[in-house]
């Protein structure tokens, strides 16, 4: 990682970073036709942050993502790229608890709001991991020399649920008959079914809103997605 920042004034700053991640050499399988791949990813960020008041600040970041799965001998697999943005808010104030001035802070970050990424020269596109995170913290002074801090955060992935292979198999049995064994290895047909279901046609912004109500098992599963 390479990072740096520049203060524009007393209340705002610019920052930039370059990240590179490599998995090294990876053997795709133990079969005779296995190949060795060298997947890697890199991202370049530029961000602006500003203190809007004594207790409130905000920041935005723009990001370029490049991802290469390393299948150099596979004409069907190409490197993917995407653009994304982050939005962050932070508030830090004071409240009175039992006669003690306590510090209460909260923060919200929505990251990777942006385009999809394709590894097959644009034929199909996948969602990048848009994520929302919200956190709270309370600092309470016990006495003149000691304080206690309580903090918690919640995380939610903002991408629509991808229809599973099991759903595809169930659909095929209902419409075409047969057994699960007839369809469980039909990955190309499964992908064609995904296209028919419109999964690849959902825009990134629509996917964010769709992610709040598309869990197969309803609201209970939506709550389980919050970590």
Please annotate each region the language model reported.
Residues 1-227:
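Subset of outer-membrane beta-barrel
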């Amino acid at each position: 990682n390479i990072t740096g920042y520049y203060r524009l004034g007393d209340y705002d700053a610019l920052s930039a970073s370059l990240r590179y991640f490599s998995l090294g050499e990876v053997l795709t399988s133990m079969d005779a036709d296995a190949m060795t791949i060298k997947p890697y990813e890199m991202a370049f960020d530029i961000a602006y942050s500003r203190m809007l008041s004594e207790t409130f600040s905000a920041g935005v970041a723009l990001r370029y993502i490049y991802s290469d799965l390393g299948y150099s001998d596979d004409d069907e697999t190409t490197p993917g790229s995407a653009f994304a943005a982050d939005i962050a808010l932070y508030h830090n104030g004071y409240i009175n608890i039992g006669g003690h001035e306590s510090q209460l802070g909260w923060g919200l970050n929505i990251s990777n709001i942006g385009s999809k990424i394709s590894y097959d020269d644009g034929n199909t596109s996948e969602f990048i991991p848009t994520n929302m995170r919200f956190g709270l913290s309370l600092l309470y002074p016990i006495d003149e020399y000691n304080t206690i801090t309580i903090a918690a955060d919640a995380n939610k992935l903002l991408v629509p649920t991808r229809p599973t292979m099991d759903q595809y198999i169930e659909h095929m049995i209902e419409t075409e008959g047969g057994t699960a064994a007839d369809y469980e290895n039909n990955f190309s047909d499964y992908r064609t079914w995904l296209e028919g279901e419109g999964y690849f046609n959902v825009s990134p912004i629509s996917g964010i809103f769709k992610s709040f109500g598309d869990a197969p098992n309803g609201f209970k599963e939506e709550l389980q997605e919050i970590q």
